[in-house]
Amino acid sequence: MHILKLPWFGHKAENKQIECYSVSINSDGSRLASGGLDGNVKIWDTKSILHFKNYEAEPATLNNKNGINLDTLNSDIIRRPLCSMSRHNGVVTSVKFSPDGRFLASGSDDKIVLIWEKDEEQANRPKQFGEAEADLEHWTVRKRLVAHDNDIQDICWSPDGSLLVTVGLDRSIIIWNGLTFERIKRYDIHQSMVKGIVFDPANKFFATASDDRSVRIFRYYRKLSESSINNYEFQMEHIVIDPFKKSPLTSYFRRMSWSPDGQHIAVPNATNGPVTSVAIINRTNWGTDISLIGHEAPCEVCCFSPRLFEYDDSNDSQKNKNGMGNFTTILATAGQDQNLVVWTTRQSKPLVVAHDIVSGSITDMCWAPDGQTLYFSCLDGSITCVSFEDNELGKVVSENMNDLQLHRYGADRESATFPESVEQLLLEEKSEVTEHKENKKLAITKPPTTILKSRPEEVRPKEVSPKINNLTPKQVNKLTQSITITKNGKKRVAPLLVSSSSKISVPVLGTSGKVTKKFQIGSKLSQTSYFLPRLGVSTSVQGLKSKNLVHEFNQTNEANNDDQDNDNEDMGIDSAKVNDNPKDALNQSVSDATLRRQRNKIKRAILETRYPSCFQLISTLPDNLFNNQAILNSKVNQILNNNFNSKRENNNEIISGSSIDAIDEDLIFSVIVTGIQSIEDRSSIIINDAYDANTSITSIVEVRNGPSWKVNEDDITDFEYGDRIDFQDPTRVIVSNDQNHTKRSYTVFFPYKVQHVLPIIKNRILTFYVLASFNGTIQIISAKSGKYVTASMEVGNNVILLKQEGDYLMCVTNQGLIFVWKLPNLPVERFLTGVVRGISLAPILNNMVEVPSIEKKNLNKRHANIPQLMMPNVRKLDVDTRNGSPLAILEDNNEVYKFSLDLMVWIKVVDPWYFLALTDSPVDSFKTGNCIDSLLHKSYKSFEEDVKRSKIGLYIYNNSEETNELQKVMEARFKQSIELAGQIA
């Protein structure tokens, strides 16, 4: 190990050392960036620094006071920074290179983040005014990110460089796009200053550390429903609190590090009992069973080596089954005790402990890409390089092995594929089992002051410590209820709200204290942190008083609402509630907007289940109920194909996350009005000469659905117990006509909501009304008197379609089940007869399901194809009036199916492939004399439209023997299939 402390390697001004706060190295290890108290960002050449690693000075050849042999040094060694940038107006607290090394992000206490990029065109520019020496490289500012309200403490890039996260003393977590540097999200979730940020090398999580004594882990992934660059979704995965309950608040940084294999997070400034420690968070369960103990003062920075190391232990009999050997990771920790400690996961004791290696607190560290060179900055202004010899830490494994270790967490798959897929969970579960087996050999006896080892594999009952009674009695608020005695001697006890005695203020819905987030376009744009006077720059002195007045006015009228420019609602955080109750901050109070979003998500899932999109064309329900995410592809296809001669208008609203509120089933079906024209039934009365059999009667059915019934007694808050009624606003069905209101006017009550009303007309005479509820209850009543014709029938699911065809009634549920009954012929018949009992449409629909596959070469592409379930729509359902068997025609391929009552299976009546042979023979020549003819014409008409849109290609018959034979065979087969379909019942 070599420790290089070069006198010119650091921040200084006028021969005085200036505090250095941050260092970062680029992806190829050729450039090192540093930032310090002087407000400068300096770029160093690592080759010039590492040259001194192999230098051995001899006393006879020392030519200067620093003991450096100038004769043996190469002329290309640069003993100063390549460039020094001074664009910040404050202390540079953090610098970070992007993963590809193109950009350099620097944060300062001037609340601004600068994005630097090397300018090759001005590499050899002359010395500028005020500079001691000309820069050898030129870095220019590409972006200026303004969003923080206080000092910026830490910066981190995502492993793929697509995201940039900055944290600061304003307790904000701001997420930027790593390409366009637009602000994506801002979260003010922490309750104190945020001092550390680190990304998961598997590109699934990032973690933040704060002075609120917590570490919060966030999961992020791409949204599938959006095509924007900023299509990321962020969720809080876990909160780690236990190791930091007594952590001191004197540290300026809490710089964490994630291990290169993705298994552990090292978090500084933790405590284990009375001593300071470094907490190790396990990725599998976010547990903190391991603590690194040894630092005498709070630790401020941790840094894992970016490479895995392989060691060969001849005494270890256990090897990996795959023969890949044993891997270990290297961790460096430092802090206020001025000591550098290097740990390894191979053993419990540290590898290296360098006491008083510097004369100030160590503020930041970074490893070179080779994993064997460490740079760290210090408050004494110096930057120190620690270089290890080959195989001193272990044998460095290839970077491909790093990627292989991250595969178990889905590092090779795009985050947009599945945020938490079953495959990924299985991989993590397998990795846990392998990890436990390999860690059995590391069960070394724990030294008393070095490390606290994790819990053993065997689950033992915990020792229960005796509870000590607290001598301080708890304050109990005695609750009293008001009791009144009525005139008849009965007691009435007024209910008492228990939460009213609590000191914690609970926001009440509908009060003026409710904080609502107002959307402003400017809230998503970068804004300067400097205040401009209201009346102009020239009146800045006069404008100060106006500023203070405005500030006092805002404090009076907008208390606890100083900063609403955040996206806490996405995480389920309500800023107003957290400010009112800081103690509940860790419990994550859920905001009203989040509850509404979760309710809409559940509501959307319910709508997609109750109203499948494949039944939209056949249903009589409103179209907007079917406009869910599953039919977006169908809508796009209809638009692109221009859908010639389509009589169905596609003016429906596509449902999004915000417009789902507009769909309310209770409101849509609160009132249902149906009008029917029929003739009067005179079969039971004497017909006089003045009677006209063609006189039409208009009957009106009005359904008034009542409110939803309360399931629990606690849900009914609008009534006192003494004033309640058991039967509240039932559903009313009012029937009337325009001929004689007194003769045919009645009201029927139902204890459920009615969704469908179907009048049954036989021989132009109104006979029955069929009513269907939301839950699949079907009731048939007499059109004359409202008398029940049959008992209530339950089909199990909500009804999509009710249809009458002759003497048959067909019902289709959202599960694709078809029921057909034969209606009675009054007065000879009185009861229904079942024809088809719950046959499924799945055999003909699932036959056309398409699940596109993902090729391996497209896995890493941003816009890779995502598997989607493509189910064809049902164009029409009909009933064979001869025997009641259902018929169906599909939209995509125009196939016609019929359910055979004899065979008890779906049979294909029309195969559109045979239409290709009907060049000269019109489809009118094929007739069966029943309802199949109409479906045949519809199928052929759709086939012709597909041909016009070039969706289907035609066969070209060139009058050769082969083509003529094919055409004749196809025509014959088509004719046979039509005839068989007409004969089979």
Swiss-Prot record:
Q: Which GO terms describe its molecular function?
A: DNA binding; identical protein binding; nucleosome binding; transcription corepressor activity
Q: Where is this region: Disordered?
A: 556-587
At which residues are the WD repeats? 13-54, 87-126, 147-186, 189-228, 248-291, 314-353, 357-398
Q: Say which domain of life the source belongs to.
A: Eukaryota
* Gene3D superfamilies assigned to the protein according to its UniProt record, in alphabetical order: YVTN repeat-like/Quinoprotein amine dehydrogenase (2.130.10.10)
- Chain intervals with Acidic residues compositional bias: 560-572
Chief localisation class: nucleus
What is the documented function of this protein? Required for replication-independent chromatin assembly and for the periodic repression of histone gene transcription during the cell cycle.
Supply one GO BP term: nucleosome assembly
Q: Which Pfam families match?
A: Beta-prop_CAF1B_HIR1 (PF24105), Hira (PF07569), HIRA_B (PF09453)
Q: Hey, which family's this protein in?
A: Belongs to the WD repeat HIR1 family.
Q: What is this protein called?
A: Protein HIR1
Key word Transmembrane present:
no
Q: What keyword terms does UniProt attach to this protein? A: Chromatin regulator, Nucleus, Repeat, Repressor, Transcription, Transcription regulation, WD repeat
> Where does this polypeptide localize?
Nucleus
List the GO cellular component terms: chromatin; chromosome, centromeric region; HIR complex; nucleus
